[in-house]
Amino acid sequence: MNLKEIFIKNKCDKATKHRYYELYEQDFNGFKNNEINILEIGTFKGESTQSWLDYFSQAKIYTADTFERVSPEKVPSLKDNRVQWFKVDSTSSNCKENFKNLNIQFDFIIDDGLHTPEGQRLTFENFIDFLKPTGSYYIEDVWMLNRNNNMSHYWVKKHPNDFTIEKYNQLIESINKFKVTEYDFSSKKIPDSFILKINK
């Protein structure tokens, strides 16, 4: 199966809501049978964790979440021997120290955790050092607040302290120290269907 079919099978919104499979199939296809390390930030019910297991036959999947909404014991994919999970706040300074002790470098890091500018910036700053020089870091569901009248969207207005131009600019400033590529999958219905890909 291709990645879109795998996402759909596992009821993962990277296919059903967003079209992220278009980018990931392109970037990941050459690594399907390689022994690589993937870090996923934001586990939730494990739909994407299971999808990575199904797609990558040899990859080790590391996944991090606060697990405040779903107990890890209730996520079947976390029981796989190729998965290692962490109960952690990806924005905390302690998180970086804990991962430093693991002495692991990742081929791909996918941030599907907090979908706020500050949360994405802090997570990025915590984990970018653990990306291999040839690796790629993906920030999903980015609200591009400087365009498409996104500041007036009801969700943004409902959370005024989380979505500010200042915090958005801080995110952009932080990632712009590296090579950044934008992938716009957004629509009027789903304005945050946007990925920022970062390479060293």
Spans of model-derived segments:
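A short alpha-helical cap/connector motif
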Residues: 1-110, 114-139, 143-200
